[in-house]
Amino acid sequence: MLELLPLLFGYLIMFFGALGVVRFPDVYTRLHAATKCDTGGIMGIILGLSMIVNSWAIRTKLVILLIFIAMINPMISHAIARGAYKGGVKPKVKVDMYAWDNP
């Protein structure tokens, strides 16, 4: 029963992240929601699966996958956001703090 809590947590984060991707106004806020959805949701699901499975070999593979996702997903999201910004996609905010630092 306890192993279902991380699964439920992961599913809820995935649901609310998908809702944010649909509802948010621009690419940056949508990317933020998608990143949280991917990182948090997948981590919860993988942790829940690692608690359910009985094989140590499969648990080890799941933990390696979890570490890989935790390292790679923020870098990919940053690259997408930077590419969108350099490509001229303007954020729908009143003050662009990034433009002040990088003229």
From Swiss-Prot:
Entry-linked InterPro entries: PhaG_MnhG_YufB (IPR005133)
Residue ranges of the TM segments: none
Molecular functions per Gene Ontology: sodium:proton antiporter activity
Pfam families referenced in this protein's UniProt entry, alphabetically: PhaG_MnhG_YufB
Domain of life: Archaea
Database matches in NCBIfam families: CPA3_mnhG_phaG, PRK12675.1
Family statement drawn from the similarity comment of this UniProt entry: Belongs to the UPF0091 family.
Protein name: UPF0091 protein PH0944
